[in-house]
Structure formats: structure tokens, C-alpha cells
């Protein structure tokens, strides 16, 4: 799948789960499971409950996503 097919949405971290998984509440009210992208993992960026993040989602699975950016 091309990168242009991904949906980028903003959300807030609700809960930190094991194995670098997070529950994220999106702006539209939906709650999804998201994991951390490799760049965030490589740079040791901490993600805590309450943080605002940008999540990339596939149009084929709207229940899961990848966290690509954490707002300060």
C-alpha cells in the first residue's frame, strides 16, 4: 500500500498497554489501538497518557494505527 493511502488523524492517549501499544481516543470520538513507529522508538520519545499524537491508519482497518508524531 502506498503512503498516500494512509489516513492521518489526531488523538489523545488514554491508556498505555504492554508491548508499546496504546489506547488512543481520536478527535471523532472513536477509540483505537495504536503502536509506536520505528522513528519514535529509535529516538526514545516517551508517550504518556494525556499526550496528543498523530496516528496513521489504513483505510482497510480502522481499529488499529501507528503513532507517528507526539505534540509537545
Swiss-Prot record:
Coiled-coil zones: none
Cited InterPro entries: NA-bd_OB-fold (IPR012340), RNA-binding_domain_S1_IF1 (IPR006196), S1_domain (IPR003029), TIF_IF1 (IPR004368)
Instruction: Specify where it is mainly localized.
Output: cytoplasm
Q: Name one GO cellular component term.
A: cytosol
| Locations listed in the record | Cytoplasm
Keyword field: Cytoplasm, Initiation factor, Protein biosynthesis, RNA-binding, rRNA-binding
- Per its record, what are the GO molecular function terms? ribosome binding; rRNA binding; translation initiation factor activity
Q: Pfam families under this entry?
A: eIF-1a (PF01176)
**Does the record carry RNA-binding as a key word?**
yes
Segment forming the signal sequence: none
S1-like domain boundaries: 1-72
Q: What family is it from?
A: Belongs to the IF-1 family.
Q: Which HAMAP family match?
A: IF_1
The annotated subunit structure for this chain is:
Component of the 30S ribosomal translation pre-initiation complex which assembles on the 30S ribosome in the order IF-2 and IF-3, IF-1 and N-formylmethionyl-tRNA(fMet); mRNA recruitment can occur at any time during PIC assembly.
Per its database record, what is this protein's job?
One of the essential components for the initiation of protein synthesis. Stabilizes the binding of IF-2 and IF-3 on the 30S subunit to which N-formylmethionyl-tRNA(fMet) subsequently binds. Helps modulate mRNA selection, yielding the 30S pre-initiation complex (PIC). Upon addition of the 50S ribosomal subunit IF-1, IF-2 and IF-3 are released leaving the mature 70S translation initiation complex.
Protein name, please?
Answer: Translation initiation factor IF-1
Classification of source organism:
Bacteria, Bacillati, Mycoplasmatota, Mollicutes, Entomoplasmatales
